[in-house]
From Swiss-Prot:
Record-given protein name: Superoxide dismutase [Mn]
Catalyses which reaction(s): 2 superoxide + 2 H(+) = H2O2 + O2
Species, as recorded: Haloarcula marismortui (strain ATCC 43049 / DSM 3752 / JCM 8966 / VKM B-1809)
Cofactor needs: Mn(2+)
Top EC class for this record: oxidoreductase
Gene this chain is encoded by: sod
Pfam families: Sod_Fe_C, Sod_Fe_N
Amino acid sequence: MSEHSNPELPPLPYDYDALEPHISEQVLTWHHDTHHQGYVNGLESAEETLAENRDAGDFGSSAAAMGNVTHNGCGHYLHTLFWENMDPNGGGEPEGELLDRIEEDFGSYEGWKGEFEAAASAAGGWALLVYDPVAKQLRNVPVDKHDQGALWGSHPILALDVWEHSYYYDYGPARGDFIDAFFEVVDWDKAAEEYEKSVSHFE
């Protein structure tokens, strides 16, 4: 395995019960300690398989391992952003340059939010607000699993996990209630930071 590949589970940036009543301590514990850890483990295992195959010159299992890298790698990266995109003191609406860009690209904050909620309702994995460096604009992207439907080259700035393990214990089949709850704890400062990072890099 490359010396640069050393995936680790990051700690939550808040206590496990900090997002209650919107997301329960139990769900955060399962989600972070079991599900996210599983993607970290899967990524590490797939990287090890690829390294072993290169050393042995036997690539029979490499295609499956490469698929596991993208699945688990995207799961790891998106979960890391998802935790950072929430805060016990979050909520409200974006401000400053990010709000200006949302209004420019979507017509209004309400126009963006309605489209994002539609993506979150339809996706089989994630709803993402991304910066598209080719078109130089923000886009909402519904992603199945962790890596199906992603837009090449885009940089996620806001991630909402809509896998059932994210909400079913708290909300049952009412995904819409979970989406509403996310907006009660969303950290727009983190989203603005990711947006500014994207613009400075690509523009």
